[in-house]
């Protein structure tokens, strides 16, 4: 079972994403409300995947993704936002993330395509 850490500053989205992913067979092992706590949680929990919001209150998701993926054995990172991927272009590719899924398109199948 793929383990997941959800990093997003909106508790409602974290709860919705948790329910959706758990219903599709993922094991959500943690949640974090901002970039710094997400980096710490990724190091402590060792998830297979970090679902990471682009817009966080302390750090942007692109820099968080770079920090998480810089370590050997790092989890896969998938960026997400309520905005469309075309708004971010090369920032996604340069972040070390596997890809981007808009929040409205989030599903286990969409994540599996990126892993």
Model-predicted segments: where are they?
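Alpha4 helix (beta4-alpha4-beta5 surface) of REC/receiver domains from two-component response regulators
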Residues: 63, 83-101, 105, 109
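Hydrophobic/aromatic residues positioned on beta-strands within the core alpha/beta folds
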Residues: 79-80
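Acidic catalytic/metal-coordinating carboxylates
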Residues: 34-37, 60-63
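His-Asp phosphorelay/catalytic-motif detector in bacterial-type signaling
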Residues: 46-49, 72-76
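The feature encodes the CheY-like receiver
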Residues: 57
């Amino acid at each position: 079972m793929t383990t997941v850490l959800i990093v997003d500053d909106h508790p409602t989205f974290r709860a919705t994403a948790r329910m959706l992913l758990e219903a599709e067979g993922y094991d959500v092992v943690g949640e974090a409300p901002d970039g710094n706590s997400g980096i710490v949680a990724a190091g402590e929990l060792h998830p297979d995947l970090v679902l990471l919001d682009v817009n966080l209150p302390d750090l942007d998701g692109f820099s968080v993704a770079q920090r998480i993926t810089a370590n050997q054995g790092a989890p896969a990172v998938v960026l997400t936002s309520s905005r469309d991927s075309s708004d971010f272009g090369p920032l996604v590719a340069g972040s070390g993330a596997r890809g981007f899924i808009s929040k409205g398109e989030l599903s286990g199948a969409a994540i599996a395509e990126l892993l």
